[in-house]
Amino acid sequence: MRIALDAMGGDNAPKAHVEAAIRAVQTFPELEVTLIGNEEQIRPHLTDTTRLTVIHTTEKIEDTDKPTTAVRRKKEASMVLCVKEVKEGNADACISSGNTGALMTAGLLYVGRIKGVERPGLAPTLPTIDGNGFLLLDAGANMDASPEHLLQYAIIGDAYRRNVYQQKNPRIGLLNVGAEAGKGTELTKQAYQLLENSSLHFIGNVEARDLFAGVCDIVVCDGFSGNVVLKSVEGTAKMVFSLLKEQLTSSLPAKLAAGMLKPQFRNLKEKMDYSEYGGAGLFGLKAPVIKAHGSSDANAVFHAIRQAKEMVDNEVTKTITQKLENGGE
């Protein structure tokens, strides 16, 4: 198995990506990784070249670039070449920490969408108290959606959780402002009916305040709402740890207490850190395309590689295709 990795995307490129790739091939003996980017910047961090290949390019897509224009004009950009590796059959999956819109555009243009999928969605796994996490779909690939899109997201999410997490009957919730069936917009009301009449394990509406308690395994929503949830999670996590740090360094007794509780705080941080779950899959494409967070460190990129490997191992794309053809069955 070979995974293509855009080594120039994100805030910590290429060091974090090279370190993650080395760790990945050491962890998974059957894995090969192609690093794509500026070889002069990559090589100093390549302490081990076992099953690692570098494709050199100096061109990259910036976060400020307009996605469609950048993908069409910067044909030698590291992200574009990364996605092309999948199209040309040289890689089974690809990962980038770069411009989200550009990655979606490149994925649609070169990998292509699964037959029947109108709008691929962005799907990160976010933390829950029980440690199992929940899949959020769509987290911002498409700002609006139809009821049929939300049903497709549920089918796609169901296939992912069954194959990668080995869940027999994943619980699916519809993000809404209340738990009652009649709540919400026309979109959520119609989507509720479609989900309720499907063969999926639909548990009804779920509110944002309950998501992290682990009330369901998959949450479906339009991309606007999903992105608000995602950004709220990021902001809340930063605020909580900032406040904890402030309080626990405010006095000598507080510092002593913090030292005694260091393992517990480490466990808490790991549980709340959604990078441990991998990146956000661009679900609905013909092959795994993973968007890692722009601020991903080596650990986060490693878990994105692990996630891509698991998707290939468990033939997630094939299962999604079959489920969509059979109406979710």
Curated annotation (Swiss-Prot):
Its EC number is 2.3.1.274. One of its GO terms (biological process) is fatty acid biosynthetic process. Its main location: cytoplasm. InterPro entries: FA_synthesis, Phospholipid_synth_PlsX-like. It is found in: Cytoplasm. Belongs to the PlsX family. Homodimer. Probably interacts with PlsY. Catalyzes the reversible formation of acyl-phosphate (acyl-PO(4)) from acyl-[acyl-carrier-protein] (acyl-ACP). This enzyme utilizes acyl-ACP as fatty acyl donor, but not acyl-CoA. This is Phosphate acyltransferase. The lineage of its organism: Bacteria, Bacillati, Bacillota, Bacilli, Bacillales. The gene is plsX.
